[in-house]
Amino acid sequence: MITEDKAYDILALNQTATPEEILARYQTLKDQYKKIKEETKDLKTQLAYQLKQIELDDVFIYLRTCQKI
């Protein structure tokens, strides 16, 4: 379950981050995870980054629900 503290930890931001900073960090991480997942041939790494992408999407949904973004 995502909490506010965990959401900011996953994004590596502090809780004073602006909505613009949150969205920028989300998009940066999303792009990085996608690139790593696509470039690796190792199935275990692909699955790990798939889980990271899902977790990142959960953070986005949580913060949107809390009206932080």
Protein language model regions, located:
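N-terminal J-domain/J-like co-chaperone modules of DnaJ/Hsp40 proteins
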Residues: 1-51, 55-68
